[in-house]
């Protein structure tokens, strides 16, 4: 019987386009140094506003990845 162990790391990512773009950029960047990513949980959505317009979308995510044996 095999046991899977996951580790969870917090990540903050930003975009000037959208929240979805911020999530995708964060996942893409994390994938360059973390292997076996199994899921993400976006825990917070924020935006920076200037002159009535959103200038930055920010997401806080929990990234789950499998610990290698």
What are these regions (language model features)?
Residues 6-38:
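Short, well-ordered alpha-helical segments
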């Amino acid at each position: 019987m095999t046991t899977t162990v996951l580790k969870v790391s917090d990540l903050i990512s930003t975009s000037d386009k959208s929240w979805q773009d911020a999530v995708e950029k964060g996942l893409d960047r994390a994938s360059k140094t973390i292997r076996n990513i199994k899921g993400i949980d976006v825990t917070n959505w924020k935006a920076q506003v200037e002159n009535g317009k959103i200038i930055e979308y920010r997401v806080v995510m929990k990234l789950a990845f499998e610990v290698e044996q």
